Amino acid sequence: DGRDPDEGAGGLTADDLERANADLITLKDAMWTIAHDRLRTVREVESLAGPEASPSSLSGYLVAQQAFSAIDRLEVRGRDSAGVHLYLWGHDIGADALATLLAERGHDPLFQSGSVEVFGDSLSFVYKAAAEIGELGDNTAALRAALRSDALLRRALQAPTARVALLGHTRWAS
């Protein structure tokens, strides 16, 4: 009938079909990433930040969410403790107001969960979770709850100039 033996019924060659299949797989992967990773991240950041969060504070909460997500993935190997140390600078809290806000939390010599220290113009927050018995995700759930309920962090992140760096850890106990 004069057709190329490598052509399919739709006039596509085997190579064309392979390229189309590869493109469909790439599209499927992109759709999964959007639905299960990016939109989940948006929901988690919204949950951490709360409904009254300023647009400028969202980047700080995104930093925390990315760390929590990474800790969640690491904990699959085993879990008994996790923590984050969040450094924040560029806040607009005056010295007197900051002293009042720190009255109950500052200067903890053991730097326990919920502790805050002031270093120059920077704030240093620590959140820790540890349990000998529990389920995967318990530690980051506790960390998320602590961060979500931290009024001082929320206030400091409201400044458009606020910036965040974070160091996180999990202990693999397998």
What residue ranges belong to the model's regions?
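N-terminal glutamine amidotransferase
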Residues: 1-174
